């Protein structure tokens, strides 16, 4: 008899849960919400960036009681790999939302290139001041003017140099080095100013180039270097923080304005929480114990690679950090790039960033 009662209770609970989900779905449809909101994500789900997108989708579903369901499309699947078109497609409403890089939005939002000025930002403290200061707000305002609704910051990280030829410590070491870079013109200008030979190519072609010895190096954040196992191709890493690659959660503005305030608030809260999680993933082991503790205490998450520098060294890589004097030499060598791009970014935004860092 007792077992029969237990079975009835389990059945009743299952029916109740099903009813809750059905009611959520019905209420979502009645409110005019889509069954699925498509989210553009450049990388795959196993990268920190991809993990942040997954966390965002999970949190939005939880905080809206299942009314808003986001499906991340990884590897720029919605764009057939054309990641630089992401902000345009979101603005048009072809794609609902994105977790995107400042690199990708910079053709539409040139103010975002303030993060890509060579050797302009050098640490997490200054990065946070700029993101959360007047310069960061100027970028968000520029996005709103382009029919994009910014939600929260996240991070891909400071981009570091790896190569198979030499431990880079001076601009002279860069001479003739054939380096794979992303298709942002400022990146190409920077490497040319350093005497390198920058090559814009997709990652698959770059790996083939590494294996064949026709491409010497590349630049990416540590959070990318570890999962792509860069140690298989390169011996040397230079931790030079030459520029940084923040991420932004954003939504189609027209669609966003139609959401009730309680839904907007829930999505904003989810974006901020997911951004904090993903940023901690990218900084773990690079900012002392700060991000490690955030992940453990706030998200109950333990890093598989808690010390990325040690990990690369254990894999046989030589990891070099620039001294202040060495960094100064790189700043001087790329001054022409800075001068060329300040006007294109907007001198007012650059000055705001300087003021943010001075606070």
Where in this protein do the model-derived segments appear?
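Short, low-complexity disordered leader/linker segments with a strong preference
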Residues: 1-36, 358-359
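Active-site-adjacent segment of FAD-dependent monooxygenases/related oxidoreductases
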Residues: 131
